[in-house]
């Protein structure tokens, strides 16, 4: 019945704190309300657009028993090759880590926007959220309490992607900052989660240990080239692994406008791969410089 919409939280609270994060902003919002004041909370970014019946569909899912819901986020600005490749990457993630996971009985991965939660439950966990990445902070709390996240592909949430290599690199830097923290968290908690039989939790922690798509492709390609030079008989498995990964990603790419434009934008893929690699080195360099 009653739903609290939260949009552009960082813009609202950025003046109250020098380095405002979504986690801080959402905590400030939730402090204003009592646990039973609303039925649901729906979180969007300030630039998001949704289909007209989005709230109706979310309401139906909520009253069907879903306490945590992730909508289908799609890229709106397919204006450059970089934006098209970023959009293709997000659709691959949607099919593997959201649609694919729910088909296997695991929770959908959260995205940080286009999310809906039971208000009382979210009010309870919001003070305990930590870190700068809202999606990862919420995911870890939900999985600790065995709360399942449903993925609703029919609820389209349009967002804007970086349309230049420089913008993509800056976005990767922010993602890496949260990813490194998640990796160390996964290394600490995965053994205990495995012994406790929390398979949904284990699946998420293992996922956080994996490198990004572009870095994975780059590492396997470099390994294949090195072994080809040193001993070509040892390189076959690397080429087979590279082929299998590429086929997997292509199978996860849906039909539609993104698929059509991807064929013409694939030439920019090496640029994004190098941008991803440089983002990692940039992160390491800044950490080393800061420690000095």
Where are these regions (language model features)?
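Nucleotide-sugar-dependent glycosyltransferase catalytic core
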Residues: 161-177, 261-262
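Membrane-embedded multi-pass helical conduit in multi-pass membrane proteins
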Residues: 207-287
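Single conserved hydrophobic/aromatic residue that forms the stacking wall/gate
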Residues: 2-13
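Long helical/loop segments within the catalytic core of UDP-sugar-dependent glycosyltransferases
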Residues: 15, 19-38, 53, 57-131, ...
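Catalytic donor-sugar/metal-binding loop of nucleotide-sugar-dependent glycosyltransferases
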Residues: 139-158
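Short beta-strand-to-loop acidic/aromatic patch adjacent to the donor-nucleotide binding site
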Residues: 36-49
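Acidic donor-binding loop at a coil-to-helix junction in glycosyltransferase catalytic cores
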Residues: 131-138
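Catalytic core of nucleotide-sugar-dependent glycosyltransferases
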Residues: 91-95, 169-190, 219, 275-283
């Amino acid at each position: 019945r009653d739903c609290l919409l939260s949009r552009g939280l960082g813009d609202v609270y950025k003046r109250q704190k020098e380095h405002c994060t979504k986690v801080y902003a959402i905590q400030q919002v939730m402090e204003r309300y009592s646990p039973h004041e609303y039925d649901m909370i729906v979180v969007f970014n300030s630039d998001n657009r949704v289909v007209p019946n989005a709230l109706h569909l979310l309401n139906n899912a909520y009253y069907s028993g879903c306490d945590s819901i992730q909508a289908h986020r799609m890229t709106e600005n397919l204006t450059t090759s970089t934006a098209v490749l970023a959009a293709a990457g997000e659709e691959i993630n949607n099919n593997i880590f959201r649609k694919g996971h729910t088909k296997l009985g695991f929770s959908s991965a959260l995205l940080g926007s286009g999310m809906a939660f039971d208000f009382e439950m979210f009010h309870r966990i919001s003070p305990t959220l930590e870190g700068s990445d809202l999606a990862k902070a919420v995911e870890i709390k939900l999985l600790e309490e065995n709360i399942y996240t449903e993925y609703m592909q029919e609820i389209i949430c349009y967002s804007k992607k970086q349309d230049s290599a420089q913008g993509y690199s800056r976005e990767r830097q922010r993602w890496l900052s949260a990813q490194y923290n998640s990796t160390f968290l996964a290394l600490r908690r995965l053994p205990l989660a495995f012994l406790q039989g929390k398979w949904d939790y284990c699946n998420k922690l293992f996922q956080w240990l994996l490198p990004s798509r572009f870095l994975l492709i780059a590492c396997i390609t470099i390994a294949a080239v090195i072994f080809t030079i040193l001993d070509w008989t040892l390189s076959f498995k690397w080429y087979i692994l590279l082929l299998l990964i590429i086929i997997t990603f292509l199978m996860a790419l849906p039909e539609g406008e993104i698929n059509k434009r991807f064929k013409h934008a694939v030439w920019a893929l090496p640029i994004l791969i190098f941008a991803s690699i440089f983002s990692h080195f940039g992160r390491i360099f800044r950490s080393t410089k800061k420690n000095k």
